[in-house]
Curated annotation (Swiss-Prot):
Substrate binds at F113, I157, E158, I159, I160, G161. One of its GO terms (molecular function) is ATP binding. Gene3D superfamilies: 3.30.60.20, P-loop containing nucleotide triphosphate hydrolases. The active site is at E83. ATP binds at G11, P12, M13, F14, S15, G16, K17, S18. It comes from Vaccinia virus (strain Ankara) (VACV). The gene is OPG101. Belongs to the thymidine kinase family. This is Thymidine kinase. Zn(2+) binds at C138, C141, C170, C173. SUPFAM superfamilies: Glucocorticoid receptor-like (DNA-binding domain) (SSF57716), P-loop containing nucleoside triphosphate hydrolases (SSF52540). Pfam families: TK. Homotetramer. Two molecules of substrate bind to each enzyme tetramer. It catalyses: thymidine + ATP = dTMP + ADP + H(+).
Amino acid sequence: MNGGHIQLIIGPMFSGKSTELIRRVRRYQIAQYKCVTIKYSNDNRYGTGLWTHDKNNFEALEATKLCDVLESITDFSVIGIDEGQFFPDIVEFCERMANEGKIVIVAALDGTFQRKPFNNILNLIPLSEMVVKLTAVCMKCFKEASFSKRLGEETEIEIIGGNDMYQSVCRKCYVGS
């Protein structure tokens, strides 16, 4: 075994996926691994770099396709990817990097605001050595929340936003509204 593997962090919005991604990458940095993070370039809510909803910032490469950064990451042994659901080549990229001996950590939504799967992320599950599903707090009743609910009427899947556009909700509050 070459040590390469895939860690997948999934859950609804506001569940701490990006925070957990940053925590894991920092652990590897402390252990003297050469690390890089990649964020989806169309996500520019807070500025450059990888940002959490509570405004923590971490340096990151930006791309819309992961194959575009292949040449920039050859020297790194740990690759963190945020908003993995938006990368069309996430499955092939992660499998290739893990097979080359790299540790790949992906933070991603597992479902849309309509509770439909992000198929590229579901296709990563059988290829991953570790899968963690986080929950958030329901922004309506304050119980455990497993779903993201869009506040507006837009129907497009890729609309990037924060708590101005989305809420994390439990099953009861998702179905009841």
